[in-house]
């Protein structure tokens, strides 16, 4: 019974997270340091997000800023995160954010 309850909770959480996924464009911002961080307009500060490109590269980054404030963009990532996503040459890439 306990295992069934845990499995049901995990499935429910997965469904909730999938329902809250955003799809759109990501850009990146320069500057020093920051590690794997990002800026999002509404997600609470400190939240860990998974950002996945449509090419299949994926990272986890912590929300530590607000933005982007450019139409069509849903997230700004740090230079380190942009390198990991393979987007430093293009500057903007289509992503899903969970």
Model regions: which residues?
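Secreted/periplasmic proteins
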Residues: 2-98
